[in-house]
Design a protein with these regions (language model features):
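Short polybasic/polar patches that bind polyanions
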Residues: 8, 49, 194, 221, ...
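Short glycine/serine/threonine/alanine-rich loop segments
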Residues: 97, 225, 269
C-alpha cells in the first residue's frame, strides 16, 4: 500500500469493510490515531455499516452520494478526490480521513472545505515563496472566475462609471445580440464543446478542439452573434476555471456566476450587490461533513489557521 510506505507508524490505521448488497464492494478507511476527529470517524463508520444500497457501481462517487445526501441544489463538494499517494498521506497526518474504494484509482479525503481547493500538493515541491505565490494566484484567479463577467456586464450597463484609464474595456463594435444573452449562450456553448471533446476519440481530440475553437470563434464574431470582447472574457473565465483542482468546485463557481449575470442584467447595481450577497451566504452557511464551517478559518476567524491556508510555510523541523 503506497500510503503505508510514506507513513510507517503504528498509529496509521486501516479498517476494511464492505458495502453494496449486490456488488459487495471493499472499502478501506484510513486515519491516524490521536489526530483524527473521533466523532466524525464514528459517524462515517456507522453510515457505511448501515448503508443499504444495491451496488456502488460508480465507486467512490456512489459512496460519496450515500455518505452525505445533501440537497440537490447544493453544488459545493463535501469530499476531495486524489490519485496521489503523497496527498493522501499528508491528509492523514493532518487528521483527515481517507476512504479507498475497490476498483477506483483515487481516494476520498474528508472533511473538505472551500479552502482545500486552493491547496495543492505541488505547492510543497517548490520553495515557500513560490508555493505561496501559486496558492495566492489560485485564489485570485478563482475570484476572477466568479466576478469578472458579471462586473464587466455591470460596467457595460453603466458606462458612466468607467474611469478614463479603463475605457478600453468598452465594446467597440455594434451589438446585434444583448450582452446578457451573449454571455449566457457562451456559458452553455463552452460546456457543449467540453462534452464533445470528452466523447471524441482521443487521437482526434486536439485537432478538433483547435479547429472548433478557431472556426466557431472567428465566424461567430464575424456573423454578429458575439462581440470580440465577450469572447475574450469568456475564454479567460473558461481557462481560469481549471486553476483549482476540484472539478466540482469549478461547476459551483459557474452556477454562482450565471446567477450573478442574470441578477445584474435584471436589477443592475442592486442585482450585482444582491447576487454577491447571495453567493457569500451560500458559501458561509454551508457545512462540511463534520458539521463545521465550510469557510473556516474565516468563520470562525483564526489568524494562525489563515496563515497556514494562504501562505505556504516551511516544514516544521529541528
Amino acid at each position: 500500500m503506497l500510503i503505508r510506505r510514506r507513513i510507517r507508524d503504528v498509529d496509521c490505521t486501516v479498517e476494511c469493510t464492505q458495502a453494496g448488497e449486490r456488488s459487495h464492494t471493499d472499502i478501506a478507511i484510513c486515519y491516524m490515531k490521536g489526530r483524527v476527529d473521533q466523532e466524525l470517524l464514528k459517524t462515517i463508520k456507522e453510515r457505511i455499516q448501515n448503508l443499504q444500497v444495491d451496488a456502488l457501481t460508480m465507486n467512490q462517487e456512489s459512496l460519496a452520494e450515500c455518505l452525505y445526501p445533501h440537497k440537490w441544489y447544493n453544488p459545493f463538494p463535501k469530499f476531495r478526490f486524489s490519485e496521489r499517494p503523497d496527498t493522501a498521506a499528508a491528509s492523514i497526518l493532518e487528521g483527515n480521513i481517507i476512504i479507498l474504494v475497490d476498483n477506483s484509482p483515487s481516494c476520498m479525503i474528508l472533511p473538505s472545505s472551500v479552502f482545500d481547493s486552493i491547496e495543492e500538493a505541488d505547492d510543497y515541491y517548490f520553495p515557500p515563496v513560490t508555493g505561496t505565490y501559486l496558492r495566492l494566484s489560485r485564489m485570485t484567479v478563482s475570484l476572477l472566475t466568479l466576478f469578472l463577467t458579471p462586473l464587466w456586464l455591470l460596467l457595460m450597463q453603466n458606462p458612466q462609471w468607467i474611469p478614463d484609464w479603463l475605457q478600453f474595456i468598452q465594446i467597440a463594435d455594434e451589438q446585434f445580440v444583448p450582452l446578457i444573452w451573449q454571455l449566457l449562450i457562451l456559458e452553455f456553448a463552452i460546456d457543449g464543446l467540453r462534452l464533445a471533446a470528452v466523447n471524441t476519440p482521443s487521437m482526434l481530440t486536439t485537432p478538433l478542439s483547435v479547429i472548433a475553437g478557431i472556426v466557431l470563434g472567428e465566424y461567430s464574431v464575424k456573423s454578429g452573434w458575439f462581440n470580440s470582447e465577450t469572447m475574450l472574457y469568456m475564454a479567460f473565465v473558461t481557462i481560469a476555471n481549471y486553476s483549482q483542482a476540484s472539478f466540482e468546485m469549478g461547476y459551483a463557481l459557474k452556477f454562482m456566476r450565471v446567477i450573478l449575470l442574470v441578477l445584474t442584467s435584471l436589477f443592475n447595481l442592486w442585482g450585482f450587490i444582491g447576487g454577491t450577497a447571495l453567493c457569500v451566504c451560500a458559501v458561509a452557511f454551508n457545512k462540511t461533513i463534520a458539521g463545521k464551517s465550510y469557510i473556516y478559518p474565516l468563520i470562525p476567524f483564526s489568524w494562525s489557521e489563515c496563515k497556514k491556508r494562504f501562505f505556504r510555510g516551511r516544514l516544521p523541523h529541528k
